[in-house]
Structures are given as structure tokens and as C-alpha cells.
């Protein structure tokens, strides 16, 4: 008998105790058919690929930063912190989440491992989100305050942001364990999930998502305004077009000089400013895509995480799984987006692989 086609139906062949007592009959003693439908195998393969690719890509970014000496500075320390959080998501969180899906969202690995998994899940995902926020803030200050935001200041601020990111993530993830703020494991129903206590739901979702969401949206709005202001300033520094050549003659009889102006537009713009503007435009585009993907990946999950405990809504398990894995996929997209807009990473990757042969 094929299992229902959804993420939550990748159940193992061993039935639950209730099913054993009430549903086993003569017909159930016949040989079982394949555990997973074709669609289930495809989904399982896709999720397995997502886990492996997320781990490999973030590990590559992290290894490159550690190996290349020129990357041992800002903003690459922020990228390294993001890669650490994302590689931990792929190594510690996603595999157990995949096992959870295969078990039909029934947790059969005990209370301690459940608590550890949930704590790692909240810690690593929250750190990943706040690392994106830190990168956006660093880009914002480097674009809008490049004279004041010196290398020393930038290094100090980035280290503080990294420390605050992991400290806040640890507080949010460990609060249920340290303060008894709700329960993550139910032995009777074999459930393992983030605490459903309404007060903790508000605290965790605001601290892990809604607050950084407000920060990144504000930051990108300011970056957009700064970019528009620069374009406006560049226009005011240019001379209006001249339709025809103009001759200017000196009024003095001796000697007589004639000036002919044939250029349509004269723009006063140092070459250094042009290079800086191009760099800032790439940075603004990178931040915009990074923020956009971050919002699209995580907002469905955090909306349900906030609404469900407050209204006691019963959200179908299939949607919980989809929203959860959509959020996990953000850890796959983060390094792709950042390295795609940085030519130094592309050349560093080529050198990294060429040295292996």
C-alpha cells in the first residue's frame, strides 16, 4: 500500500503502539509494498541534495576565508560567521529534521536528543538570520558613511555584531531549557517541536525574525535613498547641453583669442568616485537580493510560528514541513548570493581547486 503523497508521510514501516493495538489484522500480515511512493522518493532525494549542497557550499566558503590571507578582515569575518551558522544548520539540524520527516513527524529518539536538536535548530537558524542583518548593516554604513566608517571602526563594529548575534541566538534557543519556558517534547504523542507557550512564541519569533526583518528593511530603504541622492548630485554637477558650438572672443584688440566650445556636456566627477559608485551599486544589489531571499524563505514559517500558538490553530503538517524546509533553504542561498557578487571569491575558488590537483 503506497503511503499518502506528502512530506509528512515518509513514515517508517514500524507502526505506532496505538496502531499496533487497534489496526493490525490478517490483511496487515501480508508482505508490505515499497515504503515510499515515487513522489516521496523524489522529495527525499531533493531534500538530501539540499542538505549536502548546503553543507558543502558553506564549508567551501569557510575554508576559503580561512585559507586566503586577504580575507582575514572585514567584511569577510561577517561572511565567515554566516557560513559557520549555515554549515551548522546543514550538519546538525537538517539531517535530524529529515529523519523526523521520514518518521511521519513522530520523534522516536528520546527527550534529550529532542531538546538538543530544538536548541541547535533555534540557535543556528537565529544566528544565520542575524548574520544576514549584520552584513546588511555593514554594507549600509560602508556606503553611507565611508569617510567615518574606517577600517579600525569597521573591524570593531563587526566583531561586536558577531558577538551579539551568537549571544542573542543562545538566549533565545536556551530559554525553554534554562527557565522551563514551555515543553519541546511530548512522550505520549511522540512530538518534538519548538515550545508552543504563547509568551515564548512571541519572544522567540520577534527576537529571531521580526526584529531583524525590521532592521534589514530599514537598512535597504536607507541604501536606496542614498543611491538616489548620489544620482541626483551627479546630475547637478554637470553642465547643460549646448546645441551649437559657441565662440568666445576677447574684447581686447591685442592679442585676439578665440575659444570654441564643442562639448555637449561637461561632468565634474573624479575617477575614484566612479569606481566607488560602481562598487556601491554592486553592494546595494547584493544586499537587496540577500534580503529579498531571506524574507521569502523565512516569512511563511515565522508567520505560522507566531499565529499558531496564539490562536490555537491547527496548521496541516504538510504545510509546516514545507515552510520549515523553505526556511532551511535560506542557508543554501546565502553563500551563493554573497559570492556571486564578489569577484575575489570566484578567483579564490579557482585557486583553491587548482591547488588540490
UniProtKB/Swiss-Prot annotation:
Transmembrane portions of the chain: 37-63, 77-103, 115-137, 156-176, 199-220, 288-312, 315-339
Membrane topology annotation: Multi-pass membrane protein
Gene Ontology, cellular component aspect: dendrite; perikaryon; plasma membrane; postsynaptic specialization membrane
Binding site for serotonin: 121
Residues carrying sugar: 6, 21
Subcellular location: Cell membrane
Ranges facing Cytoplasmic side: 64-76, 138-155, 221-287, 340-357
Disulfide bridge map: 114-192
Gene3D superfamilies: Rhodopsin 7-helix transmembrane proteins
Database matches in InterPro entries: 5HT5A_rcpt, 5HT_rcpt, GPCR_Rhodpsn, GPCR_Rhodpsn_7TM
Record note on what altering residue 286 to A does: Slightly decreased G(i)/(o)-coupled receptor activity
Primary localization class, coarse: membrane
Resulting phenotype, residue 121 to A: Abolished G(i)/(o)-coupled receptor activity
Outcome of substituting residue 226 to V: Strongly increased G(i)/(o)-coupled receptor activity
Pfam families: 7tm_1 (PF00001)
Extracellular side: 1-36, 104-114, 177-198, 313-314
Keyword set, alphabetical order: Cell membrane, Disulfide bond, G-protein coupled receptor, Glycoprotein, Membrane, Receptor, Transducer, Transmembrane, Transmembrane helix
Family note: Belongs to the G-protein coupled receptor 1 family.
Protein's name according to its UniProt entry: 5-hydroxytryptamine receptor 5A
Upper lineage: Eukaryota, Metazoa, Chordata, Craniata, Vertebrata
Amino acid at each position: 500500500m503506497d503511503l499518502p503523497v506528502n512530506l509528512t508521510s515518509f513514515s517508517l514501516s514500524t507502526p505506532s503502539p496505538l496502531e499496533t493495538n487497534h489496526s493490525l489484522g490478517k490483511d496487515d500480515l501480508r508482505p508490505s509494498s515499497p515504503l515510499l511512493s515515487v513522489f516521496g522518493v523524489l522529495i527525499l532525494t531533493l531534500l538530501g541534495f539540499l542538505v549536502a549542497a548546503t553543507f558543502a557550499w558553506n564549508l567551501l566558503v569557510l575554508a576559503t576565508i580561512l585559507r586566503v590571507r586577504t580575507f582575514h578582515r572585514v567584511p569577510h569575518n561577517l561572511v565567515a560567521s554566516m557560513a559557520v551558522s549555515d554549515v551548522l544548520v546543514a550538519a546538525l539540524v537538517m539531517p535530524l529534521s529529515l529523519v523526523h520527516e521520514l518518521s511521519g513527524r513522530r520523534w522516536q529518539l528520546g527527550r534529550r536528543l529532542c531538546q538538543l536538536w530544538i536548541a541547535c535548530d533555534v540557535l543556528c537558524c537565529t544566528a544565520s538570520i542575524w548574520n544576514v542583518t549584520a552584513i546588511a548593516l555593514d554594507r549600509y554604513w560602508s556606503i553611507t558613511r565611508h569617510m567615518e566608517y574606517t577600517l579600525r571602526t569597521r573591524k570593531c563594529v563587526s566583531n561586536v555584531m558577531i558577538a551579539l548575534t551568537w549571544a542573542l541566538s543562545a538566549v533565545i534557543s536556551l530559554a525553554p531549557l534554562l527557565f522551563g519556558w514551555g515543553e519541546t517534547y511530548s512522550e505520549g504523542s511522540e512530538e518534538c517541536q519548538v515550545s508552543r507557550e504563547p509568551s515564548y512564541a512571541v519572544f522567540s519569533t520577534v527576537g529571531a525574525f521580526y526584529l531583524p526583518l525590521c532592521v534589514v528593511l530599514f537598512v535597504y530603504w536607507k541604501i536606496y535613498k542614498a543611491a538616489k541622492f548620489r544620482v541626483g548630485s551627479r546630475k547637478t554637477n554637470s553642465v547643460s547641453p549646448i546645441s551649437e558650438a559657441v565662440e568666445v572672443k576677447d574684447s581686447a584688440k591685442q592679442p585676439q583669442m578665440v575659444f570654441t566650445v564643442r562639448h555637449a556636456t561637461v561632468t565634474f566627477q573624479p575617477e575614484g568616485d566612479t569606481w566607488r559608485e560602481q562598487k556601491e551599486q554592486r553592494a546595494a544589489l547584493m544586499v537587496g537580493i540577500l534580503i529579498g531571499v531571506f524574507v521569502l524563505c523565512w516569512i511563511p514559517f515565522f508567520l505560522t510560528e507566531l499565529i499558531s500558538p496564539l490562536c490555537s490553530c491547527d496548521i496541516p503538517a504538510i504545510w509546516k514541513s514545507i515552510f520549515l524546509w523553505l526556511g532551511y533553504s535560506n542557508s543554501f542561498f546565502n553563500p551563493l548570493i554573497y559570492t556571486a557578487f564578489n569577484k575575489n571569491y570566484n578567483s579564490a575558488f579557482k585557486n583553491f581547486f587548482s591547488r588540490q590537483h
